[in-house]
Amino acid sequence: MTKPVLQDGETVVCQGTHAAIASELQAIAPEVAQSLAEFFAVLADPNRLRLLSLLARSELCVGDLAQAIGVSESAVSHQLRSLRNLRLVSYRKQGRHVYYQLQDHHIVALYQNALDHLQECR
């Protein structure tokens, strides 16, 4: 017996009740979902992703980051502020220079996993 194939716009209505299954399922809390949405919204900017790609390799100052992605230091500082607010990057001051690095290994893993996924889908 073959499974039916759905055409665009078709839906399937489940037969029977699924109360037992549904009672065991639990979605994340609304406030957690909101935090995740804000997190991914910050990552939705191409220049921020380019900055993360550079910081995944090395600690860099604002001037180096600006030159590497071809935007002003002011624009880089603005993007870094958004990343810093979500604790994706941290910084240290050395004299007049401020050096940025990714906050922790979770950010590197998230970035690398997303890249791997995109390459597998090609």
Swiss-Prot record:
Alphabetic keyword roster: DNA-binding, Metal-binding, Repressor, Transcription, Transcription regulation, Zinc
SMART domains hit by this protein: HTH_ARSR (SM00418)
Domain HTH arsR-type: 28-122
Ranges annotated as DNA-binding: 62-81
Keyword Zinc included in the entry's annotation: yes
Residues annotated to bind Zn(2+) 1: D104, H106
One Pfam family this sequence matches: HTH_5
GO MF annotation, one: DNA-binding transcription factor activity
The protein's role, per its UniProt record: Transcriptional repressor of the expression of the smtA gene. Binds two zinc ions per dimer. The complex of DNA and SmtB is dissociated by zinc ions.
Protein name as catalogued: Transcriptional repressor SmtB
Originating organism: Synechococcus elongatus (strain ATCC 33912 / PCC 7942 / FACHB-805) (Anacystis nidulans R2)
